[in-house]
């Protein structure tokens, strides 16, 4: 293979008439099939297929180039002879590959002038401890040269979008910059990366909560979800930003409340500062002009990554029909039968156990299925003898309850990850998974699609759904891009070029819908010829087609924007709010009520409460929220069924109880037992008692759909405790995302007693604890720091800043505080 080193220079692409379709009609597919499934393969055949690959990779056809690259990577991994891949990597600017080969595989006997020259040339692509590809370096240069221009960056996972954010923060550190992230988890991850990068001083505040902002500050760095940014824009109607970065910007295309809100804040920010610089970061979008909201006029430059380093291997395991295992080839759109040693296995957990690598992501759509599968897999695996896992289980058991299902899984090297796992637990177990080699499995949902990075060399897809719909081509590619990140492939100690071929296993079994066609699903999302097309649905985007089906929605969105920020829409001739409560509803993002129709009635009811004096207890608060707002919710509004539950007296009592726990600052462990005790009283009063449990339910009641209720009778104590754990998280989210909006409106109207308002919103009236909450700490941790470690924490209430002493972690460890709380501090430092 030394002959390949004579080609280590740039070769122009050859003109050709060969296409993939024509190639399919040659003898090559049969040869390729034997090669890919590792059938007996003569050396002469290897030489043939490598020669064809060398030809394909130099043609002027992207798909054939990719096929040629696929063959070369597979050939080198089969033979462990990486000379050909070295040549390709140098020619195509894939310098992380060429450098890894140079450092890990013996090339000494094949060195010549070209290899020495390439070695020196590659050094200019070194960034810190890593090496960039040619397009990565070009992207960085483009980003730096476009610091004052609005741009869209379309780049797969691992291409350094986090570094681009840090570069922008460095550029705008003395101005006003906001990074919009779609989830709280990504928000905290982004904040921590900015801190660790060292581009800002330790004393510089990073705003993660609207109330951390002070109007007298000349500069600010904010990391916010769109809803929090909307509240910040409301808090100060004069605030402007010099730069906004929209992470995971493809979510802007969707038609839902969050995407509408994202478009709205961009529109408002652009109106306040027409010279604002916008940076859209996304792993996929076909046409960046589709990211432009209405009522904005900025020009958008685009940088799109076109190179490829990874070439996935797709496996299909048919459990439904028992037809065995296949390698799916995305180039020839064909399934090659395999003997993986799993033909007689009938359950998903058996497939995963047998085929698992060192680190594995298992994808499922529903939280209920995630826990069910994780527990089933745990039954097959032995307990792990690891003091760190034992210690982690002890601390999680103390923080939650010892019967927590997660602990059964963790002892077997499994964690699970979904929206009903408490934030502090999720962050802690993610760290365990990243740092402990004994934890091999993470079972997760589409939360992984929102930028969360976890190491993995294999992925198992057990469900073809995302939410209520199917996994789209875009979501599928985003999902599989989370496997074998560059930092793992090219790690100097643990890296492996076999990870250039990430294994994606589609296990077609009981978690797929009954009428699903597994093979067609894989063809639809994995075929190399599948063309990415943007589905532009958000009515606030310029390129969304408006018709009879969405014109009313556009009108609602226009009314919201113009009432929130008057003057945006020229020749506006729709409605304006006429009352204080109507204006407050708009400013607090209430969209479930036709505010313009109902505001007079809402104001009249509010006035009756105002005459009675300020509200200072949870019973009166819930009653006021129901009478003023919930009774006016439109039956067709998104989430109307969840809000309408509050009209039932039992629900009002229940949420009044939850708010009392909030006011009393109950710990998670305390709330679990209070939940269990509350349900026990219901069961004692009525053996047929049913409770609302949302997506964890199995029956309908009170006119509901989608089985959101369940019976208490017949459940074990462990089942009830685990049901309480997920319901507490979901009910807390419901309160924060729904009820607190109405609390804010009542407070805007001066209807709440101040100390009571603080306790409802924050769980405390202590201003120092509130300051820590605004900085992203949990209530239990904030209270602990205030009570026991105040000397290690510098709290500035007027500036909304919290600075931790370097000695804090050691002091907490010395006092044997719960590791979850210690890591939470570490994550916020």
Residue ranges and their predicted role:
Residues 1-829:
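N-terminal helicase ATP-binding lobe
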